[in-house]
Regions:
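Beta-propeller blade-edge and WD-like acidic-aromatic loop motif
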Residues: 1, 26-52, 68-70, 74-94, ...
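Conserved beta-propeller blade repeats
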Residues: 2-23, 49-71, 99-118, 151-168, ...
């Protein structure tokens, strides 16, 4: 499929590992109506390239540390969800198996197992910010921190993903939203 005439190739979601020695990137190519994605890691000098995931779909990713990456993807053997993967291996763990909706994960700077992530709008246009522990393979640790309304006028190209981000002390999360009718930056404190 990659070499079919008319295929379009793109890379995005480039992110350096915490020590700056490796990077990850989503390599995407489009062939007709079909989209393919691979999660690739590589040394900063271009050596030691590794296809970490070549399953049906890979979306948002985040380095946990210099050797592990959490990603939302649809694995052939596990379905859609968040997966914690070890770089340069095919080893992975399906975390929070009850969650099957894509979001933007990021790790707490003061707790290496705590992850914040968001959701896209539900049918009732509600988006959520959640936290959970990545060593939880049942889903008991997942808690909703905030629910916000996403008006229909902000959809498609003008949508506003929440993109939750940690404050450096791990005591608050900021996020983008349009629930007040305009784009804004908001903060939710962590108890």
């Amino acid at each position: 499929e990659m070499q079919e005439e008319g295929s379009v190739h793109k890379v995005n979601h480039l992110m350096l590992s915490p020590n700056g020695k490796r990077f990850m990137v989503l390599y995407r190519w489009f062939c007709g109506q079909r989209k393919y994605t691979r999660l690739i890691t590589c040394n900063i000098d271009g050596t030691d390239m590794y296809v970490l995931s070549d399953d049906d779909m890979v979306s948002h990713c985040y380095w946990k540390n210099d050797e592990e990456i959490i990603a939302f993807e649809r694995k052939k053997d596990g379905g859609p969800g968040y997966y914690l993967m070890k770089d340069k291996t095919q080893g992975w763990t399906h975390v929070w198996p009850q969650l099957s909706n894509d979001g933007h994960p990021s790790y707490c700077p003061t707790n290496n197992n705590l992850v914040v992530f968001d959701t896209y709008p539900s049918r009732s246009r509600i988006q959520e910010i959640k936290i959970g522990l990545d060593n939880d393979t049942v889903g008991d640790s997942v808690k909703v921190l905030a629910r916000v309304f996403s008006p229909f006028k902000y959809d498609n190209d003008t949508r506003c993903d929440l993109h939750p981000r940690w404050r450096q002390d791990g005591k608050a999360i900021c996020f983008d939203s349009i629930f007040e009718g305009h784009r804004g930056l908001y903060i939710v404190n962590i108890d």
